[in-house]
A protein has these predicted regions:
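A short, structured beta-strand-centered segment in the mid-to-C-terminal lobe
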Residues: 59-67
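Peripheral (often C-terminal) accessory segments that flank ATP-dependent C-N-forming ligase machineries
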Residues: 131-286
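Short, well-ordered beta-strand elements within core beta-sheets of diverse protein domains
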Residues: 16, 59, 119, 205-214
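Active-site "cap" helix and flanking loop/linker of ATP-utilizing ligase/carboxylase catalytic domains
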Residues: 68-90, 96, 105-168
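Conserved ATP-binding module of the ATP-grasp superfamily
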Residues: 1-19, 50-57, 75-80, 240
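Acyl/amide activation-and-transfer machinery of modular secondary-metabolite enzymes
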Residues: 49-59, 201, 205-206
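Beta-strand scaffold of nucleotide-dependent catalytic cores
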Residues: 13-15, 22-44, 48-51, 77, ...
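A short, glycine/Asx- and small/polar-enriched loop/turn
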Residues: 94-100, 200-204
Length: 286
């Protein structure tokens, strides 16, 4: 079995099963002082064959009554690993017996996440705070020793598919872009491959959707609708052909009827704006 980078795995790590829910504590350290930059809580679903797959990651203001315990545990992990400078991404399972470490990496979280969206929710990004730690260590604590708080709420939804097939169209781009909290997304994996895999893990998710709103209720209403579409109307997100025997054709989109792609000029511009929004792009950017 190979890694996600195509390199052979030569070892195995066994971990005990931790029953609970998973959270993330992202930090930036400077001279051994740790500053929380953002907190996340993962949601997961169970597939028909019993696999646990990521459903989404929500940016949260705190972890409720276990906040202090989890943050103290995360800081203790950083101290034990001697992470005294720069970014760290710590994943923790909150169990009935207390926090359990899943992983801690001396890195920022989510290189593919929209930094613009994160900045709108926090007023900064973990990468920006990291630069401050390296470039201005003497003034870092004075500048960042303030309570962690959100300006807006955010949730990154990892779409899931129970079907596998060649991709005919992605009506979900236009549909989801119309939701109040949807600010962007990433469909590039499906667009490049021309197919949708049956989702069994994070890497077989067909797309990511980025949601952000001042009202947390609106955020949850929109993601609830997306989950309903995944379960009851996947064809409204991805139109697929079940004939997988034809194999992958890199120019699959050229074989589709024109009426699936070409529209009158007066309709084309709004459609383009919708697609740019859904993909997190703006006019003139490739």
């Amino acid at each position: 079995m190979n890694t996600i980078f195509g390199e052979p795995n030569t070892s195995v790590i066994a971990q005990e099963f931790a029953d609970g829910y998973e959270v993330v504590v992202n930090t930036v350290s400077c001279k051994g002082w740790h500053r929380v930059t953002d907190l996340w809580r993962y949601s997961k679903t169970i597939t028909a064959d019993g696999r646990s797959v990521y459903d989404g990651a929500e940016l949260v203001p705190d972890f409720g009554e276990v906040t202090d315990e989890v943050l103290g545990y995360a800081f203790a992990v950083l101290d034990a690993l001697k992470i005294t400078i720069g970014a760290a991404h710590t994943e923790i399972m909150v169990t009935a017996d207390g926090p359990v470490l899943i992983e801690c990496g001396a890195r920022a979280m989510g290189g593919s996440f929209s930094q613009t969206l994160l900045r709108s929710c926090l007023g900064y990004t973990q990468l920006e705070v990291s630069l401050d730690a390296y470039l201005s260590p003497d003034t870092f604590r004075a500048r960042w020793d303030r309570p962690y708080a959100l300006l807006r709420y955010a949730l990154f939804k990892f779409l899931a598919s129970t079907r596998k097939g060649m991709l005919d169209a992605i009506p979900g781009v236009t549909l989801l872009a119309g939701l109040p909290s949807v600010k962007g997304g990433n469909f590039l994996g499906s667009l490049e491959s021309g197919e949708v895999e049956r989702t069994v893990d994070l890497f077989t998710s067909p797309a990511d959707i980025y949601l952000c709103h001042e009202d947390r209720r609106v955020l949850h209403e929109d993601v609830s609708l997306i989950r309903d579409l995944e379960k009851e109307a996947q064809n409204l997100l991805f139109e697929m052909s079940p004939d997988h025997a034809q194999g992958h054709n890199p120019e699959w989109y050229l074989e589709l009827p024109d009426d699936l792609w070409l529209k009158p000029e007066e309709v084309g511009k709004p459609d383009a704006d919708t697609i740019w929004k859904a993909l997190g792009l703006r006019e003139g950017v490739e």
